[in-house]
């Protein structure tokens, strides 16, 4: 888990290093992983014995947001120069990514949409609820259900968004590991669904990731090509559009 977060952070540094860079990465998890927002409290509020007993990895994201249990999902990251040739301010970049996620889900005949910035709920302390227990502006929903948890980080000249796209209801199990398990479970039951649950058929992470990559290419107006991680100063395969 920590390695995945380090890679995403490194891609952000690479993207910020020149004015015309964009890279997309899809990845998975070798075991269920609890990822925490950059300033979310831990271990306070968590049942660390249960986390250890069930073999969960724990990682802290370079981005904000609240806790996500990564299991049975599709995951991706996109980092880009900002404003870049797409002339995006940081928030516009994040919204472009969310719109691409919604467009990818729409190809599966799901009525996905980005939550508009006008729908702001109450401001809660970091870690007050799991990520999927509520929707926030810039994330993706189908009806009242949150379908994608998207977190972003912005630096001078660069932006990163990475996302958890649950396929099943496994992500709701995050409630089991919280001290407020009953309350968290109730919130998740009312707000969180996986794509398979809404679609009523099986999906693979690869299917979803393929649609995401295609939608991001359209959203940013680029032709993505396979590239070695070394091209971004790393050591694994990525999809990228280097300067």
Predicted regions and their residues:
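Structured loops at beta-to-helix junctions and adjacent beta-edge loops in soluble globular domains
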Residues: 27-29, 37-39, 79, 150, ...
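Short, electropositive, low-hydrophobicity segments enriched in small/polar residues
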Residues: 41, 68-69, 153
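DPxDG-like acidic metal-binding loop motif
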Residues: 69-82
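Active-site loop/lid in soluble adenylation, ligation, and acyl-transfer enzymes
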Residues: 1-53, 57-61, 127, 131, ...
């Amino acid at each position: 888990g920590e390695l995945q977060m380090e890679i995403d952070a490194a891609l952000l540094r690479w993207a910020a290093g020149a004015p015309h860079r964009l890279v997309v990465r899809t990845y998975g998890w070798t075991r269920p992983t609890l990822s925490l927002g950059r300033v979310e409290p831990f271990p306070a509020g968590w049942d660390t014995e249960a986390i250890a007993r069930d073999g969960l990895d724990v990682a802290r994201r370079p981005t904000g947001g609240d806790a996500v249990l990564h299991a049975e999902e599709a995951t991706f990251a996109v980092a880009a120069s900002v404003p870049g040739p797409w002339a995006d301010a940081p928030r516009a970049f994040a919204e472009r990514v969310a719109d691409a996620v919604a467009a990818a889900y729409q190809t599966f005949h799901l009525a996905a949409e980005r939550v508009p910035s006008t729908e702001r709920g109450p401001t809660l302390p970091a870690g007050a609820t799991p990520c999927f227990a509520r929707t926030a502006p810039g994330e993706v929903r189908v009806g009242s259900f949150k379908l994608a948890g998207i977190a972003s980080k912005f630096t001078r000249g660069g932006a990163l968004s990475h996302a958890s796209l649950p396929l099943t209801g496994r992500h709701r199990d995050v409630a089991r590991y919280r001290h407020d398990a009953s309350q968290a479970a109730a919130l998740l039951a009312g707000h969180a669904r996986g794509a398979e649950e809404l679609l009523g058929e099986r999906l693979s992470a690869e299917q979803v990731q393929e649609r995401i990559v295609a939608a991001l290419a359209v959203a940013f107006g680029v032709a993505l090509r396979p590239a070695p991680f070394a091209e971004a100063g790393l050591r694994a395969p990525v999809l990228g559009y280097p300067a």
